[in-house]
Amino acid sequence: MEELTLEKFEEASEIVSRVTLETKLKYSEYFSNQTGNKVYFKPENMQYTGAYKVRGAYYKISTLSEEDRAKGIITASAGNHAQGVAYAAKLYNAKAVIVMPTNTPLIKINRTKSYGAEVVLYGDVYDDACEHALKLAEEHGYTFIHAFNDLDVACGQGSIAMEIIKELPTVDYILCPIGGGGLSTGVSTLAKKLNPKIKVS
């Protein structure tokens, strides 16, 4: 995938909607009073895996051929992306291998395993785990799904903006958290395509 087009976002949103909850906006009286604006939260923590990451993972896997899915999926993560990929792979009956740093909390390891993924502990930090995952991908023919540096993943995450604007067409500002940048890339790009005047930060 080379470009985030409106058509791709629409496709991703339709595919993602099959397996995710459309988390409804929650009005915050407290923050609205504090800011002088109408403030709403989108509670993605209510998704099946506890985070939005499953959106990007599921859409990415949907773009793979049956042959590639049959070979297996791999990623490196110590948190929500691990669970998103594990859950999405399970829905496709695809093998998932998740490489996690050795200091990953046991609760995250067990949660990832609960979705049927094989967990490999390697390295002290994410970069070590990521390097090892790429090595395993090359050795076994797995498809590596990056947590954020992947336009298909970002396109899947962007489905959040589709839901926000569908539910609240008058929204004029979206405040988006940023880590690696996949969520903010997807949300900001789609929001601007749907409403060029909207502000995203």
Predicted segments, located by residue:
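PLP-dependent amino-acid enzyme catalytic core
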Residues: 1-201
